[in-house]
Structure formats: structure tokens, C-alpha cells
């Protein structure tokens, strides 16, 4: 089992510093992505095209952070040939940055929908769903990053479990909005923008779950992807304290 103290156990202080640096860079990228998601949701709800444009402009910075962290991981793998928990840390970081970058992409899509809705003027049906699901996925991203920062497999498990709730509520919202469009065809264009924004939010939840699963792999040493929530819970609880 890995914890924060594990990062300081190497004879080489330089290796300790390299591991802590790349982990810190991941969390810094995560903080920026988390802000991007929050701002995208607020831009959509508040019809703030200026804030939406800021979200889209951050995308290049996030992409550059992904490339930089990838390079750090490659250098550590080549120079240090890490094993055991160190190797799991590098693998988890290198995969998590992919999900963070994709969360940023989805936030940018939400911002684009916000700009389009601002241009159309009239507020469409669906903002209640955006506010609700947006709040849920914001919490998932925040807690997935907190779990990574604290090496907390239990918190990571709760993020993965919560993804089912988001998926269920997304499907419910989708049915309601499709019904609304059938009743008022004049609203189709506007409501479609809301539907696509909700789809991006649902995908953000999926990527937050991916990061949570990587935290469990990092801390417990077990790959829990594709095994279902019941077995995932068993793996986390059975390996607790090892």
C-alpha cells in the first residue's frame, strides 16, 4: 500500500524530488481543470459569454501541461527504472493527465454551447438540469483530485460509485428535454445546445471516475477498471490496511 510517506523513502533525494515534482504538477493541472469545469458551468447558467471565452482560452495551457507531465514521466522511467509503488505512481500520473486533458476538452465544449446560447438570446429549458448535474460532476472532479493528493482509496471508491448517479440523472434529463422539444419544436435549436452541454458534463463524470480508479490502483495495487462496483468495493475493503 502506498501513502504520502512512500515518496520520501528513497536513498536518492533527487529521485524523491522528481516524484514529488511530477505529482505536484499533476495536481496543479488538476486544479486548473477543476476551475475550467466550474467556470464552464457558471458561464452556461449565467449566460456569461466572456467567462465562457476564458474557459476556451485556457485549453492550450492545459494541453501544454499534459505534454510537460508526459515528458517528466518518460524521463523518470528512462533514468530511474522505477518498480512497485513508484512505477504505479508514474503509470497513474501518465494516465490521469489524459483524463484531465479530456475533462478540459469537455469543459471547453460546454463553454462553446454557452456562447452559442448567448448569441441566440432567449433562455431555453434545461438550466435546472445543467445546474444540478454540473454541481455533481464538479464534486466528482474535486474529490477524485483530493483522493489522488491524499492517496485515499476510500474517497476514490465513493467517486466511482457516484458516477452511476450522474449517469442515471443524465438519462432522466435527456428524456425530459427530448419530450420538451417534441412539444415545442421552436425550442429545438436551443435545447439541443443544452443536451450537448449535459452530454459533456456526463463525460466529465466518466473521466473523474477513471482518475478515481487509477487512485485505487495506485494505493491498493489492484487494477479495478472494468470489474464493476461490487468487486471494486471488495478490492478496496479487502486490501485496507495492507
From Swiss-Prot:
Keywords: Chemotaxis, Cytoplasm, Phosphate transport, Transport. The keyword Transport applies. One of its GO terms (molecular function) is protein homodimerization activity. The keyword Transport applies. Disruption phenotype: Mutants are constitutive of alkaline phosphatase and show chemotactic response to phosphate regardless of wheather the cells are starved for phosphate. GO terms for cellular component: cytoplasm. It is found in: Cytoplasm. Transmembrane segments: none annotated. It comes from the Bacteria. One of its GO terms (biological process) is phosphate ion transport. InterPro entries: P_transport_PhoU, PhoU-like_sf, PhoU_dom. Homodimer. NCBIfam families: phoU_full. Belongs to the PhoU family. Plays a role in the regulation of phosphate uptake. This is Phosphate-specific transport system accessory protein PhoU homolog. The gene is phoU.
